[in-house]
Swiss-Prot record:
It is a multi-pass membrane protein. It comes from Escherichia coli (strain K12). Residues 88-381 form the ABC transmembrane type-1 domain. This is Putative amino-acid ABC transporter permease protein YhdX. The gene is yhdX. It comes from the Bacteria.
Length: 393
């Protein structure tokens, strides 16, 4: 009986590792809760002392300032909530453009690093070593102040067949206007794609069963080109083009690619493509050389070997670090505030914060946007990575 009591007493003593672990965890939780409570109380007290009301009611108030680029309709008197949407769309736009351009450029630069051509290999190496070792902010300044801002003014703009004009105020290009046959055109395009994909799959199945290869692309080309043209002939033009024209000291009509967007896209695309190129090179070199020899022994030409044998296997190595580069693009897009591009940081965490004083709300919303975008990219890339992963039986 006494032995049982001493055992229970010993198990509840501080010398017991389990007791110490639980005690330390409880103390840590109490400390964290206390710090959070102190921060909350301190924040509320400071806001009350300064007469700042918390909450998101400010989103319904009028902004009172213009925005040079907006993908949706925006007027100077629109609300701060609409400013938030404009900044979000501008951030998504520059992130998407940079991801596409950096991926394409990095892919070809990475292939050039493995080329048998000495000059091409050295030029790609120089490209990578230069652009990945210069801070992205300096590259943004270079493209914006040293290149784009030194272009001629609107009256001396560089013209391309009087359809597009390049000046220090941006690139003006014709903008599409929806016509009467737009819906019919879209339906025709979708139908052509569906029929072409079905035809490719049917011919692939036929080739597997019989060993005979049927040429699919001529019929697919006729479908993709012919059906939309037929829809336009029957229902009218799908699009009309608004061509920019010089009016006074600037161009009117069309759409404009502002210098800030161009500089940001160029800088981040070039900067990130240098890292992606090294990822592509490492991924290709990670594929066993026996795969190259096996494809060569089957008589496959180098482009086919690369496209159908090497790249599919290299993707398993490429995708994880490539995801990190895509996330870096989204986060580096916040540098747009340095040259005045109206993204989330410049518009919402900058102008809106200064006008409303709602620092906690604006910063929290801005941080949440970047967090959600990053998590979405990670989720999509992880799903794709699992689809291409080798499944062991």
């Amino acid at each position: 009986m006494s032995h049982r009591r001493s055992t229970v007493k010993g198990s509840l003593s501080f010398a017991n590792p389990t007791v110490r672990a639980w005690l330390f965890q409880i103390l840590a939780v109490v400390a964290v809760v206390g710090i959070v409570g102190w921060l909350f109380h301190n924040t509320v007290t400071n806001l009350n002392n300064r007469g700042i009301t918390s909450g998101f009611a400010f989103l319904d108030r009028g902004a009172g300032f213009g925005i040079v680029q907006h993908l949706i309709d925006y007027q100077q008197g629109d609300t701060y909530g609409r400013v938030f949407i404009v900044g979000l769309l501008n951030t998504l736009l520059v992130s998407a453009l940079c991801i596409v351009f950096a991926s394409v450029l990095g892919f070809f630069i990475g292939l050039a690093r493995l080329s048998d051509n000495w000059l091409l290999r050295k030029l790609s190496t120089i490209y990578i070593e230069i652009f990945r070792n210069i801070p992205p902010l300096l590259q943004i300044f270079f493209w914006y102040f040293a290149v784009l801002r030194n272009l001629p003014g609107p009256r001396q703009a560089v013209s391309a067949f009087d359809l597009a004009f390049l000046s220090n105020r941006g690139l003006y290009i014709p903008s599409p206007q929806l016509g009467d046959g737009f819906i019919a055109f879209i339906l025709a395009v979708v139908m052509a794609i569906v029929l072409s994909v079905g035809l490719f799959r049917f011919n692939k199945t036929y080739q597997i069963k019989t060993g005979q290869l049927r040429r699919t692309w001529p019929i697919a080309a006729v479908l993709i080109i012919g059906l939309p043209l037929l829809a336009q002939w029957l229902f009218g033009a799908a699009l009309h083009w608004d061509v920019p024209a010089l009016r006074g000291f600037n161009f009117r009509g069309g759409m404009v690619l502002i210098p800030e967007l161009a500089a940001l896209t160029l800088a981040l695309s070039v900067y990130t493509s240098a890292f992606i190129a090294e990822i592509i090179r490492a991924g290709i070199q990670a594929v066993p050389y026996g795969q190259h020899e096996a494809a060569r022994s089957l008589g496959l030409p180098n482009p086919v070997t690369l496209r159908q044998v090497i790249i599919p296997q290299a993707l398993r190595v490429i995708i994880p670090p490539l995801t990190s580069q895509y996330l870096n693009i989204v986060k580096n897009s916040s540098l747009a505030a340095a040259i005045g591009y109206p993204d989330m940081v410049s518009l919402f965490a900058g102008t809106v914060l200064n006008q409303t004083g709602q620092a906690i709300e604006t910063i929290a919303m801005t941080m949440s946007v970047y967090l959600i975008i990053s998590l979405t990219i990670s989720l999509l890339m992880n799903i794709y990575n699992r689809r291409i992963a080798i499944v062991e039986r």
